[in-house]
Amino acid sequence: KSKMFRLLQGDVGSGKTIVSLITALNVIDSDFQVALLAPTEILAKQHYNLAKELFPKNISIELLSSKSENIDKKRIILSLKNNKTQMVFGTHAIFQKKIIFSNLGYIIIDEQHKFGVRQRKLLSDKGGNNCDVLLMSATPIPRTLTMSVYGDMDISVIKEKPSYRKEVKTYSKLESKIDDVLSFVKKEIKEGNQIFWVCPLIEESKKIDHQSSVNKYKFLVKLFPNKVGLLHGKIDSEEKEKILNKFLNKQFSILVSTTIIEVGIDFPNANVIIIENANK
């Protein structure tokens, strides 16, 4: 059989994860192990929970990350080696030398642009020469770039979204209409919804007249005490994950962020995104 090396492209919410899990079931049914790699623990955990919900109960799956308890890590490492675990969901922890698979046949890498070629090879080597690889990305890649950078892989594109997806409504407001926007935000919070508020800069700049996330955070905290969080590139990855987890668990209603905001993570209660200086 020929080895699969495929990129699956599709917009956020188009169903890439479901497609990958269906293909994983086929591989498991053929007595091979599967590894799904995600860049953050929060995303790996969401994929793991979805699989637990969808997979038959007799399929053994595990979640492995750098934050896993040592006793759990030892158990998972042993079960992968002994072919007791059929699919593992994890972060960079899966790259470790001590992670040895009994019969790895399929690797799924979500948000593939977050991982380097060497990292992908490290994981692929754990499955031998015939290990299939599926990369997933929500980032549209121009055809010419695809041919030059990804010329050695097949490409599949999900062009349609599930029929139940509601239409996204987009509105444009002048800066002078901020009171209208705030009234709308207040109404959404009252209804139990959450809001992403995206700014192009972290801090105020004398050279560029754009909104900064820090200033917007200070402004919104006064209006919505204890309901606003802040996320930007100067925050370390561990703290960033804590903030995203708090937002996911509805500990606050508005997340002010720069464009580093994660794609792929499912925030079921966040149905509004406000983008300052959208032209940037």
Model regions and ranges:
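Inter-lobe coupling/hinge segments of SF2-like helicase ATPases
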Residues: 1-280
